From Swiss-Prot:
CRISPR (clustered regularly interspaced short palindromic repeat) is an adaptive immune system that provides protection against mobile genetic elements (viruses, transposable elements and conjugative plasmids). CRISPR clusters contain sequences complementary to antecedent mobile elements and target invading nucleic acids. CRISPR clusters are transcribed and processed into CRISPR RNA (crRNA). A ssDNA exonuclease that has both 5' to 3' and 3' to 5' activity, yielding 5'-OH and 3'-phosphate groups. Has Mn(2+)-dependent endonuclease activity on circular ssDNA. Changing residue 283 to A: Wild-type exonuclease and DNA unwinding, reduced endonuclease activity. Its cofactor is Mn(2+); Co(2+); [4Fe-4S] cluster. One of its GO terms (biological process) is defense response to virus. Changing residue 197 to A: No exonuclease, endonuclease, or DNA unwinding activity. This is CRISPR-associated exonuclease Csa1.
Length: 291
């Protein structure tokens, strides 16, 4: 998730070696034709379709239930927030400072973090600092590398070389019956979508990549053949990444569309799909389903 120019080149080489055989009927730009087309006027959020195997959380939300936000969800939200703010700060400082180098960037990032620290609890601050320093170290070194290789770069070109991706990339999902979306990271040069997860692996995380790919295809009419799924763990000492390149295959696209149709059906008809057999205690609605 902390992409550099070298990372981008390695991913590009991997992608070139993999097959890209996607049925045109399953491209997002075919949103006006089945199976991508949806008759429903309801818009469903991709994030609401990844936690419950029966999608009962969608039903409960329609009925007005509010789930409990547990520790794991809060920690995941913190990591996502610090990640997005940190990457944005790197870009902002490069844009705002002429002839900035890695050492200056480290100083500025340190000052920026301590201005954020006042809004965090002590435990949150520990994990946030580890992640913030991780981001700072990577892109301070990358800034020095780019400056040593290129001269007379515009600030915009410098930013694009140091941080070659967007965070919280907005996507309009309305043509697919989805809400407005935000992709954790988007590398336009490849193109590649990336999602950061902080819990354990779920197959539905791969399905969500298919949803984002379809939505981008519907809006921009460019093919998205791969996604990057990264499980990020932040401890008190380090940041660990476990990332996997995911082909956005026909089967993955079809499964996502089936899941979307089911979610919309639940929203439109208000039919309870029943309690899942694989409920997890950290689910927001666990106490609703298991009082």
């Amino acid at each position: 998730m902390f992409f550099t120019h070298s990372d981008m080149l390695l991913l590009s080489k991997r992608i070139k070696k993999l097959p890209k055989n996607v049925d045109e009927e399953l491209r997002g730009w075919n949103w006006s034709e089945p199976p991508v087309y949806t008759r429903s006027l309801s818009q469903v959020s991709i994030s609401e379709m990844v936690y419950c195997s029966t999608l009962r959380n969608v039903y409960l939300k329609v009925k007005g239930f509010r789930g409990e936000i547990g520790r794991q969800i809060l920690q995941g939200s913190l990591i996502h927030t610090i990640y997005a703010i940190g990457i944005e700060a790197i870009k902002r400082f490069i844009y705002s400072r002429e002839s900035i180098d890695g050492s200056t960037l480290r100083t500025l990032m340190g000052d920026e973090f301590y201005s954020l620290l006042k809004d965090l609890r002590e435990e949150e601050g520990i994990y946030a600092k580890v992640l913030w320093d991780h981001i700072t170290n990577i892109y301070s070194a990358e800034l020095d590398r780019v400056r040593s290789k290129f001269t007379n770069l515009t600030r915009d070109s410098l930013v694009s070389q140091v941080v070659p991706f967007y965070v919280e990339f907005p996507v309009d999902g309305s043509l697919l019956g989805l809400t407005n979306l935000r992709v954790d990271a988007f590398i336009p040069h490849l193109p590649l979508i990336a999602e950061m997860k902080t819990g354990k692996y779920r197959y539905t995380h791969e399905l969500s990549l298919a949803g984002y790919a379809l939505a981008i295809e519907s809006q921009y009419e460019i093919p998205i053949d791969f996604g990057y799924l990264c499980y990020v763990t932040v401890t008190e000492k380090e940041v660990k990444n476990n990332c996997k390149l995911i082909p956005i295959s026909d089967s993955l696209r079809s499964e996502f569309l089936d899941m979307r149709d089911k979610a919309q059906d639940i929203m439109d008809k208000g039919v309870d799909p029943g309690i899942a057999k694989d409920c997890e205690s950290d689910c927001m609605f666990y106490k609703v389903c298991h009082p």
